[in-house]
């Protein structure tokens, strides 16, 4: 989701190059068509606006066209420097990064949860059918009792979550670390996103769902989002994408990109609030 530019575009290209069958979505349909035509491995695309109520339905259509889904990657987001606190900009940021984020991530999570429940039910039915056949065979089943018991244990293990783990990976930001006065709605929504992902990770364990969550926190990336700005330590989208794909494939839960920003975030967290608000007020 959000594959028409920036990090989302680079991650889609890299996943396709790594052998994944990729479905892409975003608001700009012409960009989606161009990407699909130019990138082997991108097998489906769909125009989706995360701020629209029908966006989850469109996501389900894309999943159906793909024939299933193992990974949902969310990179849709907007943000501005907004020292003047323009209300329209603030509300648009909340609409996309807040409402749109929850709308799509919860839709992906619920789809995975339903699939896991259906798969577990099917495995249980298959195990029950095998047990019935073994019982009907009488003495033969008795001789092969140990084998049947072993199969039952294997089925139970699979039902308890040993199947391939689904994964939801989302781009938040280092902006979630502290409130940034220059971008109030942006940093606030990024904080919300990080907490929401943490909640889903906890809920997946509570419900014994085999769904992994990856929270990706990049620093300033040279994309359209910050075009024309003079932010320091800007990262290349291609480099960030490579780190993201590695993190996904390794099952990382949280990754801050890159090492310089990990040091910066650690320093930010040590600053007390009374000092932080004074530091950021200095021009």
Specify the residue positions occupied by each region the protein language model found.
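Short alpha-helical oligomerization interface
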Residues: 82-95
């Amino acid at each position: 989701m959000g594959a028409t530019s920036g990090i989302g575009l680079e991650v889609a290209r890299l996943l396709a190059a790594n052998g994944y069958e990729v479905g892409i979505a975003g608001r700009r349909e012409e960009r989606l068509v161009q990407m699909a035509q130019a990138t082997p491995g991108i097998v489906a695309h769909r125009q989706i606006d995360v701020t629209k109520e029908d966006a989850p339905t469109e996501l389900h259509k894309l999943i159906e066209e793909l024939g299933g889904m193992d990974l949902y990657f969310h990179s849709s987001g907007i943000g501005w420097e907004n020292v003047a606190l323009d209300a329209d900009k603030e509300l648009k940021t909340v609409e996309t990064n807040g409402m749109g984020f929850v709308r799509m991530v919860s839709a992906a999570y619920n789809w995975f949860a339903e699939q896991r429940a259906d798969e577990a039910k099917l495995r249980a039915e298959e195990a029950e059918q095998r047990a019935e056949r073994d019982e009907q065979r009488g003495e033969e089943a008795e001789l092969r009792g140990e084998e049947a018991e072993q199969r039952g244990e294997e089925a139970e293990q699979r039902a308890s979550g040993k199947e391939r783990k689904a994964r939801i990976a989302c781009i938040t930001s280092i902006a979630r670390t502290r409130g940034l006065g220059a971008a109030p709605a942006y940093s606030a929504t990024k904080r919300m996103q990080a907490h929401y992902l943490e909640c889903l990770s906890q809920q997946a364990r509570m419900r014994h769902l085999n769904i992994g969550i990856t929270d990706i926190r990049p620093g300033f990336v040279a994309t359209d989002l910050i075009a024309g700005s003079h932010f320091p330590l800007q990262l290349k989208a291609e480099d960030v994408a490579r780190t993201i794909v590695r993190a996904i494939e390794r099952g990382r839960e949280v990754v801050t990109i890159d090492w310089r920003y990990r040091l910066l975030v650690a320093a930010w967290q040590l600053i007390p609030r009374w000092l932080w608000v004074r530091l950021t007020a200095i021009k």
